Amino acid sequence: MKQRIGRCVACIALVIVLAACSEPLVEPRAPRTPTAVIDRYNAIVATAEAGDDLLMRARAYYDRGNIWFEQQNYTEAIADYDRALALDPSMSRAFHNRGLAYALLKEYDAALRDYAQAIHLDPAYRRAYENRVRLLEELTASTPDETLLQQLADDYGSLARLIPEAEAPYRYRQGLILVRLNDRTAAREAFDAAIRARPQHVDALYERALLHYAVGDLNAALADLDTALRLSPRAANAYYARGLIRHAQGDPRSAIADFGQALLLRPDYPEALIARAATYAEQGNITAARADLKRLDELQLDPALQPARETLRIRINAP
């Protein structure tokens, strides 16, 4: 009995902390007395334009661009970053900040190009990776694009290397993206790395168990779920997954117990109801199977689960 295993994906919170002047905040803050501030930077630009130092002039444009950004005038910010980069194309932070401005204007292709150039110029530029990840997560949330998903997985890997203290959550997220790409081998390696970095990472243990289950390595899957449940004994999805594995191992009594525990923790868990009802039916306990089917009928069922319910109904000859 192979059911699609529902996931409870815990996504890491990407907190982008940028310096107030040298780099704008991702989330624009309230504008500050715009006229007085911008006038001061206009004067700095005018002074730089009167001189012969092109790098000083580029820096003046860059600094004024950051002020425009803080005032949420992203068009003017981009114009100043353009001027700065025309004079000094090695300014990785100007590319990064222009990418932020483009992203806020929903010009996503331009934003991705600028993030890529910032990273090309400075391969250890953490903020550029973090903000590109933020944008790629948004772009791939509802419309999967294989190229963007692969870039996202690669970026999580880069962040795991650049920020060793955060390796576990970044490798976990990388694994989830690789699962979406159906790259099970690479996903397994990412979850392995997450668990090495944090052996008590329950979500990584759960996801790795699903991969073991998918390739038929039931003992390894069971071991990961046992560990996950010792660490988090109220994880309904882990009980459900372990029930599937025990059923596949020919242990229906233990499977029913696990499905029951999942339902104690989450009474409206439709997959667990379907699995337990089917197992009851296999054991000849039609009364219990019909009771679970009745509970299913009281739920607003996802359309993807409705065929399984109707197959179950026919199987137990329920009206």
Regions found by a protein language model. Give the residues of each.
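Helix-start (N-cap) detector for alpha-helical repeat units in TPR-like alpha-solenoids
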Residues: 58, 92-93, 126-127, 167-169, ...
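Register position in tetratricopeptide repeats
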Residues: 70, 104, 131, 138-139, ...
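Terminal, low-structured helical/coil segments at or just beyond the last alpha-helical repeat
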Residues: 282, 287-319
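Conserved structural position within tetratricopeptide repeats
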Residues: 46, 52, 83-86, 117-120, ...
